[in-house]
Amino acid sequence: MRPVLRGAFLGAGLIFLVSVAGALVDRAVDDFDDSGWPVTIFLAILVAYGFAGWGAGRVAPTSPLSTGALAGLGAFSVWVPVRVLIWAVRDDSRGLVSGDDAVFTLGGVFVNLVFAAALGMVGALLAGRRERGRLAGESASPS
């Protein structure tokens, strides 16, 4: 449980930083929606899901896939209430789950859940392999 929480909060922290950077860029760029920034921010969030899995897989290298998937999903789950608070505080005409430009759409939430689980598993698998290799190297070396 501890590796999953560690990875989830690592990923959520990175997503928070990416979102703050995105908000700053949104204020600085005149036509944010038609620029390349939304794609860049989305890719950075995908990397954060991978880092969530990596953070969990480093601590629990024996079960990287389940640990990484749960850490990635946890990062997304921790971020959702924060995003709702941001929506509530901002003076914005967008609906939370309805309207033409809703903050959360069913498709968007589903895609993020799939990416969070998959990239969390990839990150944990990479970290787990690295840790197992390091541990095997330590046990094979003469003391």
Regions found by a protein language model. Give the residues of each.
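Juxtamembrane/disordered regions of integral membrane proteins
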Residues: 1-143
